[in-house]
């Protein structure tokens, strides 16, 4: 979440310099989600199916509703010949994703089990850099000639932001809060990681 969409945080340095530098061959904007601070699976459900979680008050569709196949964006892409992979570097059982992704028509689900024990972590969670390196690895091993769709739910910036062993490199001026410093420092690390991913795919023939 970029707090500049709702305010003007004053930080000791820019926390998204690479993304801010992109002005060509890119579409930028904002989106609204049905939840904040948790319940990521609800946002996933809305994005992938186009349905609203308002139909499921107090419920998480992945957990309570997924007992059969669901038409989704993945279905449309599969009909067009895409290889469809879901990735989330956490336990496959969280929010019953292993079941939900299968019912959403994904060919494969890459969970924390497919990441090396030596993969870079921050605050105990897989870093965006390690996550994106896994995307590149997966792409390079995809079915030859097959178009490729990968739905990725990262973990690096998951709350909370009170880990005393994490070294924050950015200070949020005007806030006496280690949590804010950690959050914006993590965003900077995300910006560096997305730079790696975008630069890689800029060199790939479409």
Q: Could you say what each language-model-derived stretch is?
A:
Residues 1-206:
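Solvent-exposed soluble domains appended to multi-pass membrane proteins
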């Amino acid at each position: 979440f970029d707090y500049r969409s709702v305010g003007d945080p004053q930080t000791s340095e820019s926390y998204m310099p690479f993304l801010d530098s992109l002005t060509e061959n890119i579409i930028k904007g904002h989106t609204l989600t049905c939840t904040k601070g948790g319940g990521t699976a609800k946002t996933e459900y809305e994005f992938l199916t186009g349905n609203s979680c308002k139909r499921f008050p107090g419920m998480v569709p992945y957990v309570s509703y997924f007992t059969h196949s669901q038409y989704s964006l993945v279905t449309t892409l599969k009909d067009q010949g895409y290889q469809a992979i879901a990735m989330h570097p956490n336990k496959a059982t969280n929010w019953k994703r292993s079941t939900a992704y299968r019912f959403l028509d994904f060919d494969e689900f890459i969970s924390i089990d497919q990441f090396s024990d030596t993969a870079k972590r921050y605050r105990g969670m897989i870093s965006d850099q390690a996550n994106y390196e896994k995307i590149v690895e997966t792409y390079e091993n995809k079915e030859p000639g097959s178009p490729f769709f990968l739905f990725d739910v990262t973990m690096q910036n998951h709350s909370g932001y009170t880990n005393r062993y994490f070294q924050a490199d950015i200070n949020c001026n005007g806030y006496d809060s280690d949590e804010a410093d950690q959050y914006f420092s993590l965003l900077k690390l995300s910006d560096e990681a997305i730079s790696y991913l975008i630069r890689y795919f800029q060199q790939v023939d479409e």
